């Protein structure tokens, strides 16, 4: 059962590759290039997708449940 505190980013479901669990804390695992693809499918250019992702998602810390990004 996934903890309700696991953070799923809206619009990036296609980039989820799994879950991580450590001492009862669940973290969603995303594949970075699939995040770019999801953003480009929403109309962004590759450059804009990379910049937006890195600024708004990749470099953010939102607590113990901060998602993991696999390169």
Explain the meaning of each model-derived region.
Residues 1-71:
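C-terminal alpha-helical interaction appendages
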């Amino acid at each position: 059962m996934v903890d309700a505190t696991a953070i799923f980013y809206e619009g990036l479901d296609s980039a989820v590759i799994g879950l991580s669990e450590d001492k009862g804390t669940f973290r969603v695992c995303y594949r970075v290039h699939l995040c770019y693809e999801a953003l480009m499918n929403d109309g962004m250019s590759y450059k804009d997708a990379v910049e937006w992702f890195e600024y708004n998602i990749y470099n953010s810390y939102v607590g113990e449940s901060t998602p993991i990004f696999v390169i």
